[in-house]
Amino acid sequence: MTKSAELYQKAQQTIPGGVNSPVRAFNGVGGSPIFVERADGAFIFDADGKAYIDYVGSWGPMILGHNHAVIREAVIEAAQRGLSFGAPTEMEIKMAELVSELVPSMEQLRMVSSGTEATMSAIRLARGFTGRDKILKFEGCYHGHADSLLVKAGSGALTLGQPSSPGVPADFAKHTLTATFNDLDSVRELFAANKGEIACIIVEPVAGNMNCIPPVEGFHEGLREICDQEGALLIFDEVMTGFRVALGGAQAHYNIKPDLTTLGKVIGGGMPVGAFGGRKEVMQYIAPTGPVYQAGTLSGNPVAMAAGYACLTLLREEGNEKRLASKTKHLADGFKSLAAQHGIPLVVNQVGGMFGFFFTEQEQITCYEDVTKCDLERFKRFFHLMIDHGVYLAPSAFEASFTSLAHGSKEIEATLEAADRCFAILAAESK
């Protein structure tokens, strides 16, 4: 038994399921999860000392690579001055100014401690600002584990939402409507059936929680138009795409201006940080300037602010955005080419520094239903083959994978060599 397996058994005695976030348990792929001892650059090292080229990157934040010296030193320096004050600091101002400069639609913003907190707060603000209760999300998009967002579609496009987790009251979930990603008609139908009742649309501009699904042409433009016509706010959940799809986020990549934006992951440089912000008119509606209440003891934590500021300052250096996108495209194109050489049907999507692949005969993947039709068992087999070859991908067919600026040509080529061998095994097994 490996040390990771031993630790997993031990963890289950005191931690539900042995993990502090469900996807880490490998339920989506089977087997025992890797317990990480340390990480550096493009690599993680498990409790048994084995190295893996990492394409999870702590689920997105490690865009500069693990254990970056500049971020590490920023954290040490900040920690020496104190770990938490519960009072304003100058670094909060510097961080807010930098984020607003990089993402201009965020005229004002507030720091929080997680992406879930950011989306939860943005939705409360949208409801308070519009005076409406209902919100519209998309099937397969994940916006954190707040009650109003753990909702799935009903049996038809116009039915009330149903809780996707016990503990979420059905009476509460009924205020959340669920449309089909990349389908504007489904959005229009819900607005028509709930005239004047929908406060906002919240969307992952590139869906990263049903693997990696970009918007079809005109989708985001259509959402912007519908919100303008109906008096609803458009919220871009850029917790995953922020600074990764482009330096200014997916909204810069697709040239769309949302009313509110939520951020997380990259913004903290590896520390627990989130943020929400948008039009000044809307943000002024939040306490203490407005009636919508939101607060947090650790919001704007000085150590986390120092890490995030160092990360974004490095990330904005000239050439980094293009380098990240270029190496990710090279990797994605390589996966697609190698799969084709071995007769393995594979759809590969890539935007900026995120990518995903689907074992399927379908020509393209545009929504959650398409993902459910993919060969999930073949994904599980490929995942474990890649683990055996020293490559760590997202342990779920419904999660995107990520590159970092620390992934050099050596790591990319080693990954493609491993994929070549693994595709060959899959092809042989299917004969």
UniProtKB/Swiss-Prot annotation:
Homodimer. InterPro entries: 4pyrrol_synth_GluAld_NH2Trfase, Aminotrans_3, Aminotrans_3_PPA_site, PyrdxlP-dep_Trfase, PyrdxlP-dep_Trfase_major, PyrdxlP-dep_Trfase_small. This is Glutamate-1-semialdehyde 2,1-aminomutase. It catalyses: (S)-4-amino-5-oxopentanoate = 5-aminolevulinate. SUPFAM superfamilies: PLP-dependent transferases. The keyword Cytoplasm applies. It is found in: Cytoplasm. The gene is hemL. The modification N6-(pyridoxal phosphate)lysine is found at residue 265. The keyword Isomerase applies. GO terms for molecular function: glutamate-1-semialdehyde 2,1-aminomutase activity; pyridoxal phosphate binding; transaminase activity. It is an enzyme of class 5 (isomerase). Its EC number is 5.4.3.8. CDD domains: OAT_like. It comes from the Bacteria. PANTHER family: GLUTAMATE-1-SEMIALDEHYDE 2,1-AMINOMUTASE, GLUTAMATE-1-SEMIALDEHYDE 2,1-AMINOMUTASE 1, CHLOROPLASTIC-RELATED. Belongs to the class-III pyridoxal-phosphate-dependent aminotransferase family. HemL subfamily. Pathway: Porphyrin-containing compound metabolism; protoporphyrin-IX biosynthesis; 5-aminolevulinate from L-glutamyl-tRNA(Glu): step 2/2. GO terms for biological process: protoporphyrinogen IX biosynthetic process. Its cofactor is pyridoxal 5'-phosphate. Keywords: Cytoplasm, Isomerase, Porphyrin biosynthesis, Pyridoxal phosphate. One of its GO terms (cellular component) is cytoplasm. Pfam families: Aminotran_3 (PF00202).
